[in-house]
Amino acid sequence: MCLCAHTSRAQEELDDLLEGFEDELEEIITDQPSDAGPGLWELTGDLSVSASYAYAHTHSDPIKREYRGLAALRTQLRLQLDLNLPRDWRARVSGRGFYDSAYRIQGRRNFTDEALDTSEDELEFQEIWLQGSLLPQLDLKFGRQIVNWGRSETIRVIDVLNPLDNREPGLVDIEDLRLPVVMTKLDYYHGPWTLTGIAVHETRFDENPDFGSEFFPIAVPPPPENTPGNGGSNTEWAAALTGIFSGWDVSLHWARFFDDTAHLELVPAAIGPPRPQLEHARLTMLGASGNYAMGNWLLKAEAAYFDGLEYFVLAGDDKTRWDIMGGLEYAGFDDTTISLDVVRRHISGFDSRLENDPDFVENNRVETAFRYTTEFMNSRLRATYLATIFGTPFDGGGFMRLSCDYELRDALTVGGGIVLYMGGDFPTFEANRKNDRLFFTAKYSF
């Protein structure tokens, strides 16, 4: 359109000089190509190969011998189709599939059926949504999508709407772990404020390590899990009010959702004594968050109140919890970002029995995350150090990751690094303290 307007103005200015050639000039201008707008559709994706080598398991380890050495050799294809529809509406369909050859190389008979079912191969749709404006100030987005409420890159407080893929903890960042769910999201805009209402129709929980997988902490299978159905009375609800201003922003949040962390219950059996079963409590969250930019510094804060927490040893006695997170991010060095986030989770009316099997929770749980990211060679090489540690003073366990990614050319990236797991007071970290690994990735994007 800019080209056409410019051409029109030029034609008017030259009319007096070209009076005898109006028809010829008009024909020439008409035949010139104009700037094309966005196409109706765009298909993108990537093909990647990743491998990890677990070097810390010894021949004397009584468990996880099958994961010694080559722990993963995964080939993955991801595709994303974006559609540009009339009236500025958009749609997306994306999915992925992978196959992990390490299980066949190491011998499939050495692994449990549960581990093979969830980790050897997978084919699934990811984001599938339709988005557009119903009114000038009202937008709709419906379908499988991701809504990130959090301010931290590593720690979750108010970011409760999407479950996580926790099957291989520590290898990638949270932004690559979120799992989309089917939602209806309405956004109403008024000046700097946005009012959001969300209905979550799909019941989906964290994908955790299955029995027999490398990161499953015990040698016996878990009890059966009760997963609520989709929609109806199981619909999850959420709302947010967000204000974005010069140098700072603030938001208020509310959600009524299922706890991703299941608790153990004894449920009546048709015959005989009650049987154990994993259940998901219905929680209510009230939260607030904000960012404040000050020169090269970014201050981050999140706070949330959770009601309805259930535990095995306190059957019928729901608990509440306060999560408060503060963070700093500094970007004053060239091509470098440093961040530190700390969260404290406090259970009100704590009972010391909760510290024991099978609940394993503490009255006050502290989580600290430190991240250092720097770039070299005109941003073609990126190095990241990440440490996430639990407890005070850092006695709960955690992990450290050092990784590098190098862009060989525009569409081809290779990378690798090391992940070190630290044991501690938390049983899960203590069980996985020998899962240290080297990893490598190669990805071609198109």
What are these model-derived regions, one by one?
Residues 255, 291-311, 315-389:
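Detector for outer-membrane/organellar transmembrane beta-barrel domains
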Residues 45-53, 93-97, 142-144, 197-201, ...:
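Transmembrane beta-barrel strands of outer-membrane/channel proteins
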Residues 8-90, 94, 102-103, 117, ...:
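N-terminal periplasmic/intermembrane-space "pro-region" immediately following the signal or transit peptide
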Residues 73-79, 123-128, 180-184, 235-239, ...:
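Hydrophobic, lipid-facing positions within transmembrane beta-strands of outer-membrane proteins
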Residues 87-216, 246, 423:
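Outer membrane beta-barrel
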Residues 88-91, 137-140, 192-195, 247-250, ...:
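Repeated loop/turn-to-beta-strand initiation elements of outer-membrane beta-barrel proteins
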Residues 190, 420, 432-446:
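Outer-membrane beta-barrel "beta-signal"
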